[in-house]
Structure formats: C-alpha cells, structure tokens
Amino acid sequence: MADGRLNVKDFSSIAVKPYRDGAIWSEAFSVALLKNKKLYIPTGRYYIDKSVVLKSGADILADKDAEIILIKGVKTLLLRNESVADGSTGRIAETHKRDEKISIEGGIWAEENDERLGYGASGAFDEEDSFHGVSTCFLFSCVKHLRLENLTFRHTAGFAVQIGEIDGFEIKNIVFDGCFADGLHINGNTVNGVIENLSGHTEDDLIALNAYDWDNSSINFGRIENLVVDGVYAAGGENAHKSMRIQPGIYPYEDGTTEDCYIKNLRIKNVVGAATFKMYLQTPAYTDSPEKPVGVGRIENISFENISADTREPVDRQPNYLNCDPVTGNFATFEVGSNVKGINFRNVRVLLDKSKYPNAYFMTVGPKSQYIKEKGLELFDPYIDCVLSGMTYEDVYINGEHVEDISPFVKEINFGNIYPSALPFGRGVIENNKE
C-alpha cells in the first residue's frame, strides 16, 4: 500500500489450515507483523486460534467488514500487547518496559461464543492462566499512547476490551454487538484518556472504570485520573445490563501494603439509555466477612452532563429491590458507596417509577446489601461508611419535570442492624451541598 502497510492477504500461503468457510490465519498475522508493524486487513473472514501479540509501534488498519474471529474452544484471548505486567501482588516497577504508540482502527473483532465465560475459561492471558485477572478479548497493559477507533466487538465471552497501566489513550467509535460481559473494562494506573461514542449491547457494565477490582478481573491496581467519557448509548434487548461502574477502593497486597485506587478528574457527558451509575465499593460475595480487607475508596472532581437515564426498574434484579424492602431495597440512578468530594450534575434527566418502586431515587449514598439467609451469603458490602460532599447541580429533571430541589430524590442510607454479623453495618452521609 502507498503508506507502506503490508496486506495480510499477501501471507495467505501461510494460512493453510482449513476451518469452516475459510482458514486459520493466526500465523499469517504474526509473520506479517514481524515483517512490518503496519498491517492492512481487507474485507474477509480471518479465523484465529492463538493470541496475536503487538509490539511498540504496531498500527493495524482493517476494513469495516473485515472479520477477525477467535474460534470456539480457544482458552486464550484474541489480541494483546507484548509488555503486559501483573500488578496484583505488588506495584509494577517503574523500570518495567512500556510498549508505545499502538493503534488499531476498523474491523469486526469477534469470538465464536454464545454465553458468558471468561475467568480462565476464555479470554485468558495464556494456557496456564498465569495472569488470572485477565478475562478479555483485547488486553492492553503497560502502554503509552493507545488508540482504538471504529471497532466492533461481537459475542465476546469475557470483557471486550480490558486495559490498565495506560498513559494516554483514545478509544472512539466502538460498538458492542451481543457481548456477554463488560464492554470497556478499565483498570488502575490509567490516566489521560478520551472515550468517545461507545454503543451497543453488553450483559454486564457497558463501561467499567475499576481502579480497584476483584483479583479475577484485573492485573492493574491504582488511580484512574484525567478521563473524559463523551457519548455513550446503552442498547436494550434481552439480558442487556445498562450500567456504568466507577469503582475506587483501597487494594491490599499480599505483603500487607496497600494501594490507594482513587478516581479523580472524571467528566462523563452525553449518555443515553443507562439505568445506573455504580459508584460503590463491591467486593466478591462472602460469608461472615470479605476475603480481603478492602478499604472504601475515594472519588474527587467528577461531573455528569447531558445524561438521560431510565431507572424505572432496578438494574440489579435482586429480591430486596424488586420487593421494595424498606431498609435494603433502595436503588438509584446514581448509587454512591465511596467517599466523594466534588460532584456536579448538569442537564440530567431521570425516569423513576415511584408508584411501583417507592424506594427508587435520583441518588443514594451509603451501603448496599443483598443477604441470602439460607446460605449466609452477602452479595454487597453493608459495612461501608462513606461521605459525599461538594455536590452541585443545575437543570435536573425527574420524569420530565424540572426539579429545583433534589433533596426529596436523594437518600442517605443507614442500615442499623439488619442481620447477625461480626461486622458493624455502615451508613452514608451527605454534607456541604448547594445548588
């Protein structure tokens, strides 16, 4: 090509293993990228049976109808960068190599899956699942300057895209087509990024900004800072989960040290179709006490602008929400279970069905609980204490009506003793707020 790209079809002689209506192209992709970091993928169908690994400077351009498909039964992920590092047991050294300037534009990136898997069953880092927190189709970790644009992800069994330890990124014009878990899953030590125009159907969080995360869902823990999310459309359909997660926390390493996984300077605007923005700590389900002493995290300077949310039903279809439990059945468009300092709402339109769900709110602040008594199992973290301060708002609409005072639609949650527990139950506090 004129720009010096290699055409992957020039390596078709390597793709000799037949599969379905085509052939396995994994080796052809790898050889082409070794010869030239700039690769062109024309319209066609390319089956992949092992991970494609990108080095610094990799630049892939695919036609919009080019289909790159990870075949059924492959345990490992479809594509990743070379210098991935696992930070789940300790901080990644500053001297660890970072890949630089990786770009992928165009194409349909798919898996031959029809259900949620991940967590070692699919989307693994390698056959040994040596980085257990990897559960995805695309993985980028330890990268400076990442660009993903005009991509469609189809039928991904784990996350569609998982990134962490990234400095400087643009992720634009991404479609999720029948994806069974999270769409864009961002983990810690990720800074200076722009996310624009994400849409589609996912069956878990459309976007997860998880500075803190579970050990089976992240290898990178730390701050998320200086991000803009502009343009999100959450599609409906059976099993659609129309939510965005924003999760800080205090992550404990094995040696007893901790990581402050805070979120700071986050601007979210032009979102349509979301039901809930989850800003609470959630650790893995547990009996008696959480498996790790994770601390409540902090969010500083977050804004929501031009948001249209439909929260007429709870996004978490748990019995206490559906049955309107007067203590634990509260749910909201904005659910806060972190320490928040500086939060602004501007032109936010929310639908609530207070007649069916009197415990539905614009915002709740405090802990959540779903306790399964017969199993002694807690799904959330009812021991959380948190404070929200510095809230400002303008042009808030509830069910189409402009609301001058949002206090009737905001609730501080205080559980008291809701069941026998060795841990004290928590409460949320709102202070220092103004219009």
Please describe what each predicted stretch is.
Residues 1-435:
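Extracellular/periplasmic carbohydrate-active domains that bind, remodel
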